[in-house]
Amino acid sequence: MKLFLLTLLLVTLVITPSLIQTTMAGSSFCDSKCKLRCSKAGLADRCLKYCGICCEECKCVPSGTYGNKHECPCYRDKKNSKGKSKCP
């Protein structure tokens, strides 16, 4: 039993850093893409929030500050509870 727990602990310690790096890399990707996407938005903080949510789920952000949603169908097809586009 002790050997099993020790093995599980070692595996967890080896895997955890790689998962953290992957998450951080995804976040920096989304942060930079959303910063560009929301650079001309009137409500930049709201734009950045929803762009970040959509980017994390879809793994892409359309180019430019407006439109071009055909480049990322997942981003384009996300809707809020009112049926409007969730992603800026």
Curated annotation (Swiss-Prot):
<keyword id="KW-0134">Cell wall</keyword>
<protein>
    <recommendedName>
        <fullName>Snakin-1</fullName>
    </recommendedName>
</protein>
<dbReference type="InterPro" id="IPR003854">
    <property type="entry name" value="GASA"/>
</dbReference>
<comment type="similarity">
    <text>Belongs to the GASA family.</text>
</comment>
<keyword id="KW-0929">Antimicrobial</keyword>
<dbReference type="Pfam" id="PF02704">
    <property type="entry name" value="GASA"/>
</dbReference>
<dbReference type="GO" id="GO:0006952">
    <property type="term" value="P:defense response"/>
</dbReference>
<keyword id="KW-0964">Secreted</keyword>
<keyword id="KW-0611">Plant defense</keyword>
<comment type="function">
    <text>Has an antimicrobial activity. Causes a rapid aggregation of both Gram-positive and Gram-negative bacteria, but the antimicrobial activity is not correlated with the capacity to aggregate bacteria.</text>
</comment>
<dbReference type="GO" id="GO:0005576">
    <property type="term" value="C:extracellular region"/>
</dbReference>
<keyword id="KW-0732">Signal</keyword>
<keyword id="KW-1015">Disulfide bond</keyword>
<feature type="signal peptide">
    <location>
        <begin position="1"/>
        <end position="25"/>
    </location>
</feature>
